Amino acid sequence: MVTQILGAMESQVGGGPAGPALPNGPLLGTNGATDDSKTNLIVNYLPQNMTQDEFKSLFGSIGDIESCKLVRDKITGQSLGYGFVNYSDPNDADKAINTLNGLKLQTKTIKVSYARPSSASIRDANLYVSGLPKTMSQKEMEQLFSQYGRIITSRILLDQATGVSRGVGFIRFDKRIEAEEAIKGLNGQKPLGAAEPITVKFANNPSQKTGQALLTHLYQSSARRYAGPLHHQTQRFRLDNLLNMAYGVKSPLSLIARFSPIAIDGMSGLAGVGLSGGAAGAGWCIFVYNLSPEADESVLWQLFGPFGAVTNVKVIRDFTTNKCKGFGFVTMTNYDEAAMAIASLNGYRLGERVLQVSFKTSKQHKA
């Protein structure tokens, strides 16, 4: 692909600066640079199959690079279609904009501009969208949301087997206020072709009140309880039985051994704090174990959103560090969708960790 890229450059940039940028899409950049950002560029509309090495080779042909990063989805590892390049010399950064902005690569026309320094106004602007018509394309979703502001990235989740939309997507706006306006304007509305209203919410915006109650209960429970090895082993087999019920198959002993005795023991006092399994008017609650310390609610949204309607996600955090304690909860409205999520995600490798996923039931958490 590098040869194709360089060939495209030779055929396109000989006549001078590229043409105008596309009107919509991930345009997090400025036309002029500030003193602090004369060397740092953002590159949008990259082909999804472009690799880190190809990205570096393309921009390294302009001048010496201090760093470059092709941004990838944390879950799938796939390129999100944009990246950052930091040059050693401001002149090279300026040359890269004049040379590569508007370059056509495969079906994409890339956009190269100065990266804007981060600020509070542009953070936390990522939206989770569910209930989209299965026929809606990514471009149509962008058109629906672009009336509220500048879109940085967008994505519709597809079924890996069929390639058909799961009706779930993510939209990242340039500014948080734009995301807020999109929620006000589109949440609960029926776009063209939709049978039901869509849900639009922040991808990492769970109920804070419920979260604090959960954290307090878990902290107090873990501080006052201790159980011996026999109790831990019993809890493991309880979980194994639950997994058998969920999948209809017998779990291997290696699966049981991967559960953390400490985490499972700490879970035993959580019944009755709004996360009990079963219908119970609140949906079906799923226990997710072996999350990394850096995991947040957006990870759970992205993992479970493709399988059906998710009403709530919760990552349990350490009081001192605010890091994930290794587990969390997801509530889904439909049993079949919840069971499918469990069957698909239990044993799923997320980074260097293998997730353990099961239904949470009142029996599971008896002392």
Curated annotation (Swiss-Prot):
Disruption phenotype annotation: RNAi-mediated knockdown results in reduced Gap43 mRNA levels and impaired learning behavior in radial arm maze training.
Functional summary from the UniProt entry: RNA-binding protein that binds to AU-rich element (ARE) sequences of target mRNAs, including VEGF mRNA. May also bind poly-A tracts via RRM 3. May be involved in neuronal differentiation and maintenance. Plays a role in the stabilization of GAP43 mRNA and in spatial learning.
Transmembrane segments: none
Protein name according to UniProt: ELAV-like protein 3
Lineage, broadest ranks: Eukaryota, Metazoa, Chordata, Craniata, Vertebrata
PANTHER family xref list: EUKARYOTIC TRANSLATION INITIATION FACTOR 3 SUBUNIT G
Annotated tissue distribution: Brain specific. Expressed in the hippocampus with expression in CA1, CA3 and dentate gyrus.
Family stated for the protein in its record: Belongs to the RRM elav family.
GO cellular component: ribonucleoprotein complex
Residues in RRM domain copies: 39-117, 125-205, 284-362
Comment on protein domains: RRM 1 and RRM 2 bind cooperatively to AU-rich sequences in target mRNAs. RRM 3 binds to poly-A mRNA sequences.
Keyword set, alphabetical order: Developmental protein, Differentiation, Neurogenesis, Repeat, RNA-binding
Record SMART domains: RRM, RRM_1
Keyword match Isomerase: no
Pfam families on file: RRM_1
Subunit structure and binding partners: Interacts with MAP1B light chain LC1.
Induction or repression: Up-regulated after spatial learning in radial arm maze experiments and in Morris water maze experiments.
